[in-house]
């Protein structure tokens, strides 16, 4: 079974690793789509702090990932989903009742649990607060 998940994976953190481990435990081969910059077609998103190269290197070191495929826009994500032989797509449970790119494709969707408080936004905030003069 080939699994797929995707994201920007900026400021790779424990929550990402937990999600990747859970995803990989449900398939035989895990492909990760690495979004180069979510703000290209979704300006409301956060622009990555790390370069796509930095994020790729970090993901490449994660033992749960078998292949990383960069993509730029939501349209290119659709093309990616259609071009790979994906059996299962892993999406965070916070998307359970929401529409998301590719949800209409004939790929089984499984939701990953969010039994933790780790997030890139939270990490950004902690970094910002630590950088303030005391």
Task: List the model feature ranges, each with a label.
Residues 1-134:
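Nucleotidyltransferase catalytic core that binds NTPs
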């Amino acid at each position: 079974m080939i699994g797929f998940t995707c994201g920007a994976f900026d400021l790779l953190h424990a929550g990402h690793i937990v999600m990747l481990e859970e995803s990989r435990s449900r398939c035989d081969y895990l492909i990760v789509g690495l979004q180069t910059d979510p703000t290209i077609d979704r300006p409301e998103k956060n622009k990555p702090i790390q370069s796509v190269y930095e994020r790729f290197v970090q993901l490449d070191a994660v033992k749960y990932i078998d292949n990383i495929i960069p993509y730029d826009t939501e349209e290119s994500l659709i093309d990616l989903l259609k071009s790979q032989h994906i059996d299962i797509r892993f999406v965070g449970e916070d998307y359970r009742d929401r529409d998301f790119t590719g949800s209409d494709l004939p790929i089984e969707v499984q939701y990953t649990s969010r039994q933790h408080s780790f997030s890139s936004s939270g990490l950004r905030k902690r970094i910002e607060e630590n950088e303030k003069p005391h």
